């Protein structure tokens, strides 16, 4: 591990990239309160600070199913154009304020149709809000490129419909696809037709795997479904019996040697019980073993976090250096679902010069 360290204030200004971040898990607490009032939805509290604390405490159950259940209140205020436009616009502005220069936001449009919008209308509305946010961020001198990953919910039957929308909107801001939701009992291969369709249409996709479920979910996501990245993937360590020795099993070696990005989310993993502490989170050992690990927030409201906070935690509790942070930032951009020239420009023109200035 390199020796150069960094203070938090400098860290806030460094360019960042986030690949795994859910739109409905990242609303501002004040926005949830205001939108809930406008649609008549009852919240646990109407005080924004208390609501933020409620989310964080409710998510700290150590159980993925309970963690997911906290989304009911954010989803309740994202069922019309007003809520979707505001959530999307503020999403971009919040990333820009956090120093993020590239982000991929994911959401499942089927979860936003209770107010009468079609899935297509949901996608159109979110893209409109994201475009507004990017224009405002650029005008403020903090440009950020945000691409969309459409999600299918693995426990429901509209995954193929979401995949069709990813194909339809791939030239209109949608850069890829994912399936989300409870892993146990809902293997990704249940939706193989959707993944085969995406592959035929040359649309990249990631799959949530290796979080609540173990190696079989990672193997199936990669070798059966053909995922280009893995969402979370912390359980890949089950195929590395001795992390210190670094002897890899066949699946772990495949992931490392083929440079398959792991979208790791330390704070979220602590909340769902997928990891025990920041200091012992597998991201550090996997980074040191040469895996293409990336650092992510997952759900900024639910986890009470930002990219700056995630980086700070790794610096303070896992001994990370600025070189380590640069590595995972470059890793994320190398594995982003946008064209090669865009990724290269962000790495060479934005990220590397900024990190060089503090080394």
UniProtKB/Swiss-Prot annotation:
Keyword Zinc: yes
Record-listed E.C. numbers: 3.5.4.4
Any one annotated GO CC term: cytosol
Positions bound to Zn(2+): 20, 22, 208, 298
Residues reported to bind substrate: 22, 24, 181
Catalytic residues, chain numbering: 211 (proton donor)
Cofactor(s) it depends on: Zn(2+)
Alphabetized CDD domains for the sequence: ADA
Pfam families: A_deaminase
GO molecular function: 2'-deoxyadenosine deaminase activity; adenosine deaminase activity; zinc ion binding
Keywords noted in UniProt: Hydrolase, Metal-binding, Nucleotide metabolism, Zinc
Cofactor binding comment, as recorded: Binds 1 zinc ion per subunit.
InterPro entries registered for this protein in UniProt: A_deaminase, A_deaminase_dom, Ado/ade_deaminase, Metal_Hydrolase
Catalyzed reactions per annotation: adenosine + H2O + H(+) = inosine + NH4(+); 2'-deoxyadenosine + H2O + H(+) = 2'-deoxyinosine + NH4(+)
Biological role stated in the UniProt entry: Catalyzes the hydrolytic deamination of adenosine and 2-deoxyadenosine.
UniProt similarity note: Belongs to the metallo-dependent hydrolases superfamily. Adenosine and AMP deaminases family. Adenosine deaminase subfamily.
NCBIfam families membership: aden_deam (TIGR01430), PRK09358.1-2 (NF006847)
Protein name: Adenosine deaminase 2
Lineage: Bacteria, Bacillati, Actinomycetota, Actinomycetes, Kitasatosporales
């Amino acid at each position: 591990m390199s020796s150069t360290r960094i203070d938090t204030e400098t860290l806030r200004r460094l360019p960042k990239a986030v690949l795994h971040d859910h739109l409905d898990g990242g609303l501002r607490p004040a926005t949830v309160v205001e939108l809930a009032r406008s649609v008549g939805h009852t919240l646990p509290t109407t005080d924004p600070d208390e609501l933020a604390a409620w989310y964080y405490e409710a998510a700290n159950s150590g159980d993925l199913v309970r963690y997911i259940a906290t989304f009911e209140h954010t989803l309740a205020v994202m069922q019309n154009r007003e809520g979707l436009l505001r959530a999307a616009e503020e999403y971009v502005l919040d990333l820009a304020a956090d120093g993020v220069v590239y982000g991929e936001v994911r959401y499942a449009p089927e979860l936003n149709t209770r107010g009468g919008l079609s899935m297509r209308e949901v996608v159109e509305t979110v893209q409109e809000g994201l475009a507004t946010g990017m224009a405002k961020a650029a005008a403020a001198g903090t440009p950020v490129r945000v691409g969309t990953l459409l999600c299918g919910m693995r426990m429901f039957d509209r995954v193929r419909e979401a995949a069709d929308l990813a194909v339809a909107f791939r030239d209109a801001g949608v850069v890829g696809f994912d399936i989300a939701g409870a892993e146990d009992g809902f293997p990704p291969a249940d939706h193989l037709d959707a993944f085969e369709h995406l592959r035929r249409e040359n649309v990249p996709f990631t799959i949530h795997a290796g979080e609540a479920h173990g190696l079989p979910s990672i193997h199936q996501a990669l070798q059966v479904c053909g995922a280009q990245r893995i969402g979370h993937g912390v359980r890949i360590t089950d195929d590395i019996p001795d992390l210190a020795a670094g002897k890899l099993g066949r699946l772990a070696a495949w992931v490392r040697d083929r440079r398959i990005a792991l979208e790791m989310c330390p704070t979220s993993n602590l909340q769902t019980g997928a990891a025990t502490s920041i200091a012992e989170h597998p991201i550090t050992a996997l980074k040191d073993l040469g895996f293409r690990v990336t650092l992510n927030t997952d759900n900024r409201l639910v986890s009470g976090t930002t990219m700056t906070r995630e980086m700070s935690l790794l610096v303070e509790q896992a001994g990370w250096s600025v070189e380590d942070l640069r590595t995972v930032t470059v890793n994320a951009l190398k594995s982003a679902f946008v064209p090669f020239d865009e990724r290269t420009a962000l790495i060479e023109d934005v990220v590397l010069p900024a990190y060089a200035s503090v080394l």
